[in-house]
Amino acid sequence: MSTRAPAIAVLALVAATCAGCAMFGHGDEAYRLSEELGELPGVQGSDVSYVDPRLFESADIRLHVRMRDDATPEQVAAVFVAAYDALTDVHLGEEGTLYVRLRDDRLRLRTFESDAKPSDVEEAALVAAAVAEQQYRTTVDVIARDVDDPPRVRSAVTERVPKGTSAAGVEQARADIEEAYGDLPVTVDIKVALR
């Protein structure tokens, strides 16, 4: 008895399944989401890059938002919540990253099959925007993927302080950031600029 026929049937089934998966990209929705984010208060501009799903790889959506210089922490948080809502609904199962540029600071939201509450993402984004406003050049990651402990959101803050900042100044910056986050999960890294 030949094993060729069952092997061909299995390959045909896999090919049909994979072809079906490839048809379920959400590129149109990603572009609509970018337009919606661009219309939110405090937003100067918005762009998106979207990669359709491939065999054994999920789709990838990257949203880029530039905030106006006078944007408030509440406006930044509204962008995070709108993006998170879409990334955990229409784009569930897709790798999602939101990049927000706020003056000389960078804020980022990372998601993939996340189950954090939008209110927890909003709270982390509010603190991130407030910290960015108060500190020197800051990069804040709001991470809502692979976080097992409640609130299923954690933050990572990197601040680049000016060259010549003393050890006491570095520790004060760290303490200020940790105080701003209170009980929210956060890791803080302070780097002194070399130039």
Provide a role label for each language-model segment:
Residues 1-8:
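Bacterial N-terminal signal peptides that target proteins for export
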Residues 19-25:
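Bacterial signal peptide processing site
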Residues 29-54, 68-70, 74-75:
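Post-signal peptide N-terminal segment of mature Sec-exported envelope proteins
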Residues 32-34, 74-93, 128, 162-187:
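Short, non-transmembrane amphipathic alpha-helical segments
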Residues 38-46, 91, 130-137:
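Short secondary-structure junctions
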Residues 42-64, 139-155:
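Short edge beta-strands and adjacent turn/loop segments
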Residues 97-141, 195:
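Surface-exposed beta-loop interaction hotspot
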Residues 136-195:
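Extracytoplasmic/periplasmic C-terminal soluble domains
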